[in-house]
Design a protein with these regions (language model features):
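Active-site-proximal alpha-helical scaffold in enzymes
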Residues: 1, 17-48, 89-118, 181-188, ...
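Conserved active-site "lid/cap" helical segment
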Residues: 1-6, 10-13, 21, 87-96, ...
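Conserved catalytic cysteine-centered active-site region
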Residues: 1-40, 62, 76-83, 145-174, ...
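Beta-strand segments within the central parallel beta-sheet cores of soluble alpha/beta enzyme folds
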Residues: 13-18, 43-49, 98-105, 122-127, ...
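Flexible glycine-/small-residue-enriched beta->alpha junction loops
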Residues: 42-91
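Active-site pocket-lining segment
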Residues: 84, 119-122, 202-271
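Condensing-enzyme catalytic core mediating Claisen C-C bond formation in acyl metabolism
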Residues: 90, 142-216, 220, 227, ...
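N-terminal extracellular/periplasmic Venus flytrap/periplasmic-binding protein-like
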Residues: 98-188, 192, 255, 260-262
């Protein structure tokens, strides 16, 4: 009912999309694809999440929601994302210090971007909420190093003895409330409505990967998108890779050979939070703001999702 609450005409239709963490990015991609196909003129693509209202895991309540065939394929069961983040850290041999250092970087960059007004231009104040509340400009490596591993589990210790238990609340994304929205329009609609376009969306990719490692789908999704766009990594000016956990982004960087000077340059979910269904729009806003500030042309946005899925989207800044 969000579009009715927003005051849009009753003649305007709406649909709910569920791709977990990538829901808003997928909504954006579907909207752009519909515009490119000529099916739509103007679309509002957005998402919302109130994580403070719903307890994590409350949708299952300890029951098997997947059925016998799923159990036959994965007899030991899937794992939650915290364990997947630990598996990623172990697989790529990412130590605790590197995880914490990346989290510290995120808070520092987010605070600096807010001070410059780069992120604030895309924030619409709702009541007294007019800035991202999760940014901790005063955090330190010492404080982060004192946090205990967040996902230690006796059953998982036995199942995965290779895990060194390095993932903490500090190097994981925050539980957050948030919403985001983007206006996507055809070239004809832009001219007719006298809008000023900021960017174009031209290439898209979705990939699936190991559902137990889960968070690594961003690697094949990135490669798939670049192949479709006939671009190289060096052609991309900036990347926005969702900071679900430090280990996820660091593994992506190591696997693809991308330097951190191009990645999440205005901070990410470790500092800004990760309201699941809304995060795609926040990534786009951060990426576009950074491209506008630096004069870059191409930005690539990618988001890991439940079940080993990931979205990737190519953004081209317009002058």
């Amino acid at each position: 009912q969000a579009w009715l609450a927003a005051g849009l005409p009753e003649s305007v239709p709406a649909v709910t999309i569920d791709r977990k963490c990538g829901s808003t990015q997928q909504a954006m991609d579907f909207a752009a694809q519909g515009v490119i196909a000529g099916a739509y003129d103007v679309v509002i693509a957005g998402g919302v999440e109130m994580m403070s209202r719903v307890a994590m895991g409350s949708n299952s309540m300890g029951k098997d929601n997947f059925g016998a065939l799923h159990c036959m394929r994965y007899p030991d069961g899937l794992v939650h994302q915290g364990i997947s983040a630990e598996l990623v850290a172990s697989h790529w041999d990412i130590d605790r210090q590197s995880l914490d250092a990346f989290a510290h970087r995120s808070h520092q960059l987010a605070a600096e971007a807010a001070a410059r007004g780069i992120t604030g231009r895309d924030i619409v104040a709702i009541g007294n909420a007019d800035s991202d509340e999760g940014v901790r400009a005063d955090t330190s490596l010492k404080k982060l190093s004192q946090l205990k591993p967040a996902f230690v589990n006796e059953k998982m210790i036995e199942r995965y003895p290779e895990i060194a238990w390095r993932v903490t609340a500090g190097n994981s994304s925050q539980v957050s409330d948030g919403a985001s929205a983007m206006l996507i329009a055809s070239e004809h609609a832009v001219e007719r409505l006298r809008l000023k376009p900021r960017a174009t969306l031209s290439h898209f990719a979705v990939a699936g990967d190991d559902p137990i490692m889960m968070l690594t789908g961003i690697i094949p999704a990135t490669r798939k998108l670049l192949a479709r766009a006939d671009l190289l990594l060096d052609d991309i000016d900036l990347f926005e890779v969702n900071e679900a956990f430090s280990s996820v982004v660091l593994a992506w960087m190591r696997e693809l050979g991308v330097g951190e000077n191009k990645v999440n340059v205005n901070g990410g979910a470790l500092a800004l939070g990760h309201p699941l269904g809304a995060s795609g729009g926040r990534l786009t806003a951060n990426l576009l703001g950074a491209l506008e500030e630096t004069g870059g042309r191409y930005g690539l946005q990618t988001m890991c999702e439940a079940g080993g899925m990931a979205n990737a989207t190519l953004i081209e800044r317009l002058d």
